[in-house]
Amino acid sequence: MRLLIHTDGAARGNPGPAGAGAILRDASDGTVLAEIAEGLGHATNNVAEWTAVLLALESAQGLGATHVDLRLDSELVARQISGVYRVRHPDLKPIHAAAMKLLRSFDGYTVGHVPRELNKDADRLSNVAIDAPTSMSPSRSPLG
């Protein structure tokens, strides 16, 4: 199964209250299979962006995906995944390593940068995660 995954991370204050959001769709028909909105406490925007990717990949693996098409509005993270830029910050290295290990476990993957206006669903989820009361976050809701 091939999934189209949109992810976004947000931090208010950078660093500040942060959240990760993702929406996973069946690439063949666009059916939403899962949404992720997870509060991250106090973090930077880049930590939130990378955490959103990692959480989405974990969910994709759990759904049995064989291929993933990642779409992010963070050009930096898209280029780090593609290997154009290196990950240098110590806070990002373990998240990056875990995400790349997961990516390599799929039969194939693509990554692309999309304009913010094409990533509204993931952006909404990352902001929901920041705004949600602690008892509501993290929330990962597979849809059926």
Give the role of each language-model region.
Residues M1-V47, T51, L55-T66:
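RNase H-like nuclease fold core
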Residues A10-N14, V53-A129, P133:
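RNase H catalytic domain
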